[in-house]
A protein has these predicted regions:
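Short alpha-helix
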Residues: 354-377
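Short, glycine-/aromatic-enriched active-site segment of Class I SAM-dependent methyltransferases
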Residues: 333-354
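Class I SAM-dependent methyltransferase SAM/SAH-binding core
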Residues: 224-287
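Basic helix-turn-helix/winged-helix DNA-binding cores
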Residues: 1-60
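Arg/Lys-rich, alpha-helical DNA-contact motif
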Residues: 40-117
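A short, conserved alpha-helix within the catalytic core of class I
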Residues: 306-319
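Conserved beta-strand signature within the Rossmann-like core of class I S-adenosyl-L-methionine
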Residues: 325-335
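Class I SAM-dependent methyltransferase Rossmann-like catalytic core
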Residues: 175-224
């Protein structure tokens, strides 16, 4: 047979076959400068493939093939050597089998734990009655009236929120949905978490370093009775991944422009059952039906960046009216160092994106202009490759994207 026929019959690439020849495993005769695979060479190839299936290395296979070629295993010494090689491989496999049996047992336990970890009855939540006092009309500031209510002693599940000035919103499955829906075409609700897929391990490690900083700062805070807000969760949602860091005696406001994203996360949070009182708010603006001066802490993981995808304004300036006089900010800002090509790609994909997005100078300047002072910050590192994923498709390989975590407060008198 010719090499092409051998390749097709045994499902091997020609490069593989040539490698075996160059390695000395196969020694086919030549006819007119072309290799011819006679019966003996084919037997050698089949033996090589059989030994490979037994996890022998090429050097071990070469030794076994050589023993057959030199002595045909007639010598007692060669027989003993071959038996020893088989016995050693058998012992090696027995160790692996024992190891894999233990691995299978551990995996079975993990699968069983996940299968049985579902709560017998999933807790269903709504708009907490304890947080109704945070709501007001965003147009005139008056209290909202509620009607057509489906509720119990703890939550409102459905209803209508109205004001005499004409403002109205609805409560749908516990989510407050305002008239400010998103009608753009450059984004969509990420219900299957495409943003998380195909992130390279190096970037995930960078995320974790920033998470660690934010968790360290949270450990120093007493959030009992405090109101914590996080916006733009369709991109990244810090609170969801770190619910164990938050007090069930606090109050939490979660905002996104997509009701679908809020419904998805609400269902997950109900399954996880950390019993955090959460007001879910669907609104694509920053004119929320919230009282001024009600927020103690704002969480930001990419939210400031995400806001600038669609607005030329600075998110913390827009949220400023909702902060208490002693309000705090905790987050992670993403910025480029000389990211000219990445920003060109970003601005081409998102026509409404601010040209100041991903700029550390812009972030520091606008944070101060909004009346906030950064108490601490930590540059957690940078990546030059965000991988092939939806979340950072605009990031050009080679350009440095940094993550800076920060903690700050609203300056008195501002």
């Amino acid at each position: 047979m010719k090499i092409g026929q051998v390749s097709r019959k045994y499902g091997l690439s020609k490069d593989n076959i040539y490698y075996y020849i160059n390695y000395g495993l196969l020694v086919p005769p030549k006819l007119n400068s072309q290799y011819v695979f006679d019966d003996e060479t084919i037997r050698d190839l089949e033996e090589i493939l059989a030994l490979k299936s037994m996890d022998y290395s090429l050097s071990e296979i070469h030794r076994i093939i050589s023993l057959h070629r030199i002595s045909s295993i007639e010598s007692p010494g060669d027989k003993r050597e071959l038996m020893d090689m088989y016995s050693d491989k058998r012992a090696e496999c027995a160790v692996k089998v024992k190891h894999y049996e233990a691995v299978i047992k551990d995996l079975d336990e993990r699968i069983m734990e996940l299968a049985t970890n579902e709560p017998a009855v999933q807790r269903h939540t709504g708009l907490p009655l304890s947080m109704l006092n945070l709501l007001c009309c965003p147009e005139c500031g008056r209290p909202l009236e509620i009607s057509d209510v489906n509720m119990d002693m703890e939550y409102i599940y459905d209803g209508r929120l109205t004001c005499s000035c004409g403002y109205h919103a609805v409560v749908d499955d516990g989510i407050v949905i305002t008239p400010n829906g998103y009608n753009g075409e450059v984004d969509k609700p990420d219900l299957t978490r495409e943003l998380y897929k195909d992130l390279p391990p190096s970037l995930i490690s960078l995320f974790q370093r920033s998470y660690n900083y934010m968790k360290e700062e949270l450990e120093e805070m007493d959030l009992s009775g405090k109101v914590v807000m996080e916006t733009y969760i369709n991109a990244w949602f810090f609170l969801h991944n770190h619910q164990q860091c938050f007090s069930p005696k606090g109050f939490y406001i979660v905002v996104d422009k997509y009701p679908e994203t809020l419904h998805m996360y609400k269902d997950l949070i109900e399954r996880e059952n950390y019993e955090l009182p959460i007001l879910y708010l669907a609104d694509s603006s920053t004119e929320y039906p919230l009282k001024e001066g009600c927020v103690d802490l704002n969480l930001d993981f990419f939210a400031v960046n995400e806001h600038n995808f669609y607005h030329d304004t600075f998110l913390l300036s827009c949220l400023r009216p909702y902060f208490r006089p002693d309000g705090r900010i905790l987050g992670t800002y993403f910025y480029f160092e000389n990211g000219r090509e990445s920003m060109k790609e970003l601005l081409g994909t998102y026509p409404q994106c601010s040209a100041s997005n991903f700029s550390l100078t812009y972030f520091r300047k606008e944070t101060a202009a909004a009346g906030f002072s950064l108490d601490k910050n930590r540059v957690c590192g940078y990546t030059t490759d965000s991988g092939n994923n939806l979340g950072f498709s605009f990031h050009h390989k080679g350009e440095k994207m940094y993550l800076m975590s920060y903690d700050g407060h609203l300056e008195s008198g501002r």
